Amino acid sequence: MDRRLGFHYFQDINHYQSRDLALWLPELKALNAGWMVLKSPATMAIPEEFIASLVSQGINPIIDFDLQVNTQVRPEELRVILAAYAKWGVKYVVFFRSPNTKAAWVDGTWSNGDLVERFLDRYVPFMRMAEQNGLVSVFPPLQPGGDYWDLSFLKKLFQLVQQRRSLDFGSNLHMAVSAQTFSRPLSWGAGGPLQWKMPRPYTKNEIGEEDHIGINTWEWYHHLVKSTLNITPKLFLFWFGASSIYQNTLDPSLTFDSLYEQFNSARDNRAADSILGCLFWVLASPSGDPRENTSWFDDQGKPKQPSIAAYKEKLEHTRKQEVEYPVAGKVAEWMYPIDHYLLLPSYEWGVPENTLDRVRPILRDSRPTIGFSLIEALNARKVTVWNENAAFSEKDIDMLRQ
């Protein structure tokens, strides 16, 4: 099953104890989460037990240092912490806050000129330090719009990268991208500049036009990267489902289930293959914290929306239906003309209408050969049996195991 769903964890550093693991790990497993953004101080590492426990369950931590761009912290000061994180199984780090916002810069330094170039000069040494420790530095999420228009910021940044020919910035470009809705429809801005006119900074959209300031910001960034650097970036959708992280609001019209379906529908877009993770904002916050209004769970682990429980039930049902049986290895691998076969049930009256809809995640992730023939399935190296309503008997399954 798909493991690209994830969460932003508590926005403090006080929930990394054994009791927190005991509370949240079962929930994350039940939701089939594959990613977790964790806030980290620059002076000490998150406990190894917490990191290692997530990794052992297939949950990839993304370490977020949340540094102001021109803080006094130097890359060398993070060497030991980064080495520890890499040793414990971490692969991705984010160093800075949204650099196109004034809040990301030390007071009095925002208007010093050459903002984008100053950021790039600051960012590259941290990126190199991450690489030296076997980690990938994820480009920080820009605020759509922002105090410095985000699309202009990116375009200027990529122009600088091209000018500095020795800077191998784009070969392994990973970006965090805002997926805030700003209370706009989930379809807002879908298709990016291939569908809509490029918006002018800080001006009202023309009648009938849509811009990038919504949940589909990633499509606009993806196009900008491809058109300027001619590479395909790897993307993490940050703050997914928040109306605005700065106003601490969730869109009341959205449910967990509808947001997940939005993510699934976006994946029908070929560009969505570049999305590594979809990080919901926010898993939980302490009682009384302003972000409590935007959390999906309370601080005791109780879901705030019935749709979360319904989603978990749907996942559990899928787990029971989707059973993979590796074909017996008595014959050399090259003897199997089919690599992966998805065996679907059929009945005298036909095929259930919703079967193909329900197996779409398997089709997207594995691209198997699809069929209804047990005999044909015997020619595959691996068979996934969609055993809905016990359509296949134990005798059928045993044939595949032999």
Cite the ranges covered by each PLM segment.
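Aromatic-rich peripheral "rim/lid" segments of glycoside hydrolase catalytic domains that contact
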Residues: R4-E27, Q247-V331, D398-R401
